[in-house]
Amino acid sequence: MTTAIFSKVQVDMGQFYGRVSARILLNVPQRELSYQSFGEKQELKNSIGLVLDETEMQSLLPFLRAELFEPYRDREDMHDEVGYLDESWRMFTGISDSHVPMIRLPMNVIHDLAHRWPTELLYEQIVRVIRARNDRRFRKIAL
């Protein structure tokens, strides 16, 4: 049996809830990773894209397994939280090409190392991939 993975991942970020100021998109089948930033009126201000190589994709795949995210679907309580993102928010959306329905999970809570959600682990790995590229287009972006 093949393990279902997310084929598309989106992480929306903002300072005012509901207004997206930045977005990370991962398209697994196309091996594309992009970052977009938006202005106050939600107009696209900047868009940067990367085509991921085999090593970068392999580093992301363990974090894309849909089964890791299922225990958090519809969860309202936040066990073992440490704190909240200060004056900002993030929202994870994962879509698979299999039987697993789309999942949306908030990323506003900071957990201790023993209780980190898979959304946090995936986000951190995406940031590591971006930073390892040392692409000058990403240098001024706070991820």
Residues covered by each model-derived region:
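Short, well-ordered, aromatic-rich surface patches in folded extracellular/luminal domains
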Residues: 1-17, 48, 63, 70-143
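Short, flexible N-terminal segments of the mature chain
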Residues: 21-43
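A short-motif feature that recognizes glycine-rich, charge-decorated loops
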Residues: 37-73
